[in-house]
Amino acid sequence: MTTYSFPNTKGKYGEFGGRFVPELLMPAVLELEKAYEDALKDESFNEELQTYLTEYIGRETPLYHAKKLTEHAGGAQIYLKREDLNHTGAHKINNTIGQALLTLRMGKKKVVAETGAGQHGVATATVCSLLGLECIVFMGEEDIKRQKLNVFRMELLGAEVVSVSQGSGTLKDAVNEALRYWVNNVNDTHYIIGSVVGPHPFPKIVRDFQSVIGKETKEQSMKKIGSLPDAVVACVGGGSNAMGMFYPFIDDKEVTLFGVEAAGAGLDTKQHAATLTGGSPGMLHGTFTYLLQDDCGQIEEAFSISAGLDYPGIGPEHSHLHQTKRVTYSSITDEEALEAFQLLSKTEGIIPALESAHAVSYATKLAKEMNPEQSIVICLSGRGDKDVEQVKERLEGEQ
């Protein structure tokens, strides 16, 4: 059996990935790679990380049999991997705690981050508060309007939130500004990137820290279902919750993997964020991957009701898994996600993040095509408290 062994030493996943950074940043990126490799071999680092995951974040998260949702869908048994139950309400903190510990290991005192929905910003501000690091979060001005509560949360936790008005004032622009800040303050600052994007070693580091999701799911499935699930479904923006869920399953060919992008107002419009369905390969934020771009290679706007999915690129490993057909990628519209948001709330008493609602929507359709002896695991990447106000306004506007 061939084992999956990406990325290679150059940070490539097949033809995707790599490390395309300004000369000024190269030493910092190489330092990070070395610090990470050393940390992996260091028992005390791994023990400290494990302690925080267990005692601070509240892992392991449950694998929950959603019986009423299963009944509603009719078909396969649906299970939810409850990443919404982590401290701060999403999967993001699995990565930020690991990278914050790396920051201390490198002797740096300051952290810079970007955020879209605000979840990564909150998770970064949280661990910086915990570990005594200074924290600056760049956030697009459009996202600041959509996620006022998360902005206040970050400030409450001691972070400085910087509004980004350049470009479309969303996640892509926040990443640009965070990278720019890092270039100018590289000696005392570490950039905690929030997804499996950017130059090597970021996609690998984030994937590895998030892979606790898939590892737990495998063990829990064996206990709860008696076998590995037949299908695993996760939403994909940059793609860190999905990569964390998929990575431990890649060599288990009997498990079908599904990534769900945001189709926004529809794939036939320009208003979507379905990078793999509607994009083409190109260069963004230091990596080669699928992007939403025009014929001249200019990055196009990404649109989604969910602030965490409207990134015009995708992690390079997802591009590779798409090309090799190991993962099947499809998309769900804003309307379908809104329906699933309400459906899970009404059937299970669990309000999902709008991001996760995309996966719930796809999985309920998929379940109908499967039989009751089969099983699907959905990565419920976050809770929906942050989205309730936005959904309320949207539904009232439709009446």
From Swiss-Prot:
The protein's matches in InterPro entries, at most eight in alphabetical order, are given as: Trp_synth_b_CS, Trp_synth_beta, Trp_synth_beta/beta-like, TrpB-like_PALP, TrpB-like_PALP_sf
**Quick one: which pathway?**
Amino-acid biosynthesis; L-tryptophan biosynthesis; L-tryptophan from chorismate: step 5/5
Gene3D superfamilies with a match to the protein in the record: 3.40.50.1100
List cellular component terms (GO). Answer: cytoplasm
Organism superkingdom: Bacteria
Asked if the record carries the keyword Transmembrane helix, the reply is no
Q: Which residues carry this modification: N6-(pyridoxal phosphate)lysine?
A: 92
Q: What cofactor requirement does the entry state?
A: pyridoxal 5'-phosphate
* Enzyme Commission identifier(s): 4.2.1.20
Per UniProt, the keywords (alphabetical) are:
Amino-acid biosynthesis, Aromatic amino acid biosynthesis, Lyase, Pyridoxal phosphate, Tryptophan biosynthesis
Q: Name one GO molecular function term.
A: tryptophan synthase activity
Reaction equations catalysed: (1S,2R)-1-C-(indol-3-yl)glycerol 3-phosphate + L-serine = D-glyceraldehyde 3-phosphate + L-tryptophan + H2O
Family as reported in the entry's similarity comment: Belongs to the TrpB family.
- Do you know which NCBIfam families this protein is assigned to? trpB
Q: How does it assemble?
A: Tetramer of two alpha and two beta chains.
Purpose of the protein? The beta subunit is responsible for the synthesis of L-tryptophan from indole and L-serine.
Q: What is this protein called?
A: Tryptophan synthase beta chain
What gene is this protein translated from?
trpB
